[in-house]
Amino acid sequence: MLDGSMGPTKQKAARLVVDLASTAGASEFVQVENAHVSGVSVITGGHGLRRFLSDLSGDPQGTVSIPTTLNSAGCDHEKMDEMGIDYPDFLEQQFEIVHSYSELGIEATLSCTPYDRGVAPVDGIGSWAESNAVCFSNSYTSLITNRESGLSALATALTGWAPKWGLHIEGNRSPNILVTIECEMLDTADWSVLGDWIGKQIMPTWDLPWGPMPRIVGLPSASFEMRKALTASAANYGCPMLWVDGITADAPEVYSYEGEITFTKADLRERYRELAPRGKVDLVVIGCPQASVGEARETAAAVRARMELGEVISDNRLWLFMSAHNYELISGDGTLDILEEAGALVLKDTCPEVTPYNRSKYNHLLTNSLKAEHYLTSGLNRIPTSVAPIIECVAHAFDDTLVDGPAPDLAGATAKPFATAKTHQDSPFEATGRGIPSQDQWEVSGRALVTDVPITYLGYVNRDTGVIEEPGHPLDGSSIKDTILIYPKGSGSTVAPFVLMGLVYTGFGPMAIVNRDVCPLTLPAASLLGVPYAHGFDEDPTFEVNTGDSVSLSLSDGKVSLLVDSRTTEV
């Protein structure tokens, strides 16, 4: 494959797999059973995704080597009018993307819950690129998968191989955070709040090479929906796997944790207070990740109780998102009839976080999911979003007067600053790191943009300007354009490489990238587009280089030299 004998598409994929292996320090490759590819919606993949898929077209040998499924699209194409999407050529662009993936031999399941599709439980090695699915499957099933990006999963799908690294290695599958629960957790939304809360406690000084991997003690027995809600929201902050005493397999014994935290009744109450709706709710969205049959039935039960009082939902103020598989199941048991009779809109093939909302109608959403809230409030949609249990969500869908007043304003919200351990450095600094096999030699110099906090590309880096737009982040308001960008690794959505590729295509990307940690969210874009990329330094550049320093980087014989030419005077 590397020599191009199997076509240019598989050659590109093989080069990327080799680059990932080199970066991860993998000494061998593993055969992979199946893959799940993210980056489907027009608003997530954007220009970078469409151009990349276009570049792959026309190669008859460029089809996947293993069974591969596809993540959620940005709409239910049968209900475009009801969704009111106001986005030029959205449906045409969406069809183009899905068709391009289908041409690669990928099954267009259009679901972000590949673990909930009625097939026998999968095991072995997978290459999955939907963050909630990665965390769910590693935690509750026998499938082993690293937290792949959309591009790294696609490369493995095309080749059938992945580097053996990360969670493929048993010794790396152990907890690094201990979480003690000291409150009742009775509602599914409580579990969603918990997963997100854990991520918010992470300190930059904690050594979490594979991401936060908590062991949680003190939780009661859990339904499928509770377990799903926990792993989905934990994945907001890069969690690829977790353990829950009495629910998952026993956690390996560790002698010390990077952090030990306690979640109390006061913490749960405070988060609900912070997340409660302030101002009129315009739309209720349930199903992020796409709703299970159990979630649909719970929603229908709450809806039926209001219907029996003679109430109806006006203007389709409740949207329930599902996979096509689960949609078919509820259409056969009466659940769909109840929801639609009440006035709810039940959608398939899409998800709340990847849908472009019509802002002439919807400026304040209510959901039961912290995963939805995390991405809906980001730059992806930048729409104020509140959180409550399903029964409260349904109440707001029926009665738009429960909370009065204007929609909340995200611009006016005060974000808690991210924890950072960076201090200003004045001493001379030079370090040696490594490049990637697909890059032979380069030299760059320029202004450094540096943080010790991971960067979340999807939703928090403006795909048009390259400006980081994440309140509380140390680099909030800074542009990555034409910088030497130095940071630990990417975080958040596995669609990150397509956002970065789009910025590089349009001239708003960095001139070079330095990662401290192994980063399958960043490396693929650099590998495929030839952006100078360095990693594995003998000293941590995220602490030793200041934003504003003049820096030189050079690659020769696989080694990268990083030199601070002059220090910034700004502190």
Regions found by a protein language model. Give the residues of each.
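Non-transmembrane, aqueous-exposed alpha-helical and coiled segments at domain scale
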Residues: M1-A419, H424-D426, E470, S491
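Feature captures the catalytic cores and cofactor-binding loops of soluble hydro-lyases/lyases
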Residues: R304-G379, P428-V444, A448-S561
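Intein/HINT protein-splicing elements and their conserved insertion hotspots or analogous self-processing inserts
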Residues: L402-T432, P437, L555-K559, L563-V571
